[in-house]
Amino acid sequence: MKSADKKKSEDFYKIFKPQLTPQKMLKMGVFGGSYFSDRIKEYPKSWFKNAKLSKTFDVEKNRFKVKAGLSRKEWVDKGWIHKEDPLGWFQWYCRFTNGRRIPHIDEIQIKRWKAFKRHVSAIKKNCENGDIHCRRKQRQAILQWAYNPFI
């Protein structure tokens, strides 16, 4: 890797500061509890203690009891699924948290994470401080991107 490319990748790593760990997200309730289906063996068992899990999507497993996000088909159609992480962003984040680094994929996913922060700004702009019932769909979405939904 050229030194300029290496510097660019290192800069992306510096800006990536998620507010929630995968374990905390799973405990709070994300992706209708069905994100991993049967693919949890590669992750620490501790992540799944008190996690809200389901074999199929169950909106009641989500922290805000709403469906937030697009379908898997839409993820594929938009080019958001990469062969390294066929389940998408959260799978990448879990593997990243466990130490895996693939610079070109990391850069793509960190850019996507950073761009999602616009939803945090929308909640702050449109909701009274502490009103967790305001914009529940956006709150669920930012939770699924490792941002604190209780802003």
How would you describe each model-predicted region?
Residues 1-84, 88, 100, 118-141:
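Compositionally biased, intrinsically disordered low-complexity regions enriched for acidic
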Residues 96, 126, 145-147:
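Hydrophobic transmembrane alpha-helix bundles
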Residues 96-120:
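Short linear, low-complexity motifs centered on an aromatic residue
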Residues 138-146, 150-151:
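Eukaryote-biased recognition of C-terminal alpha-helical segments
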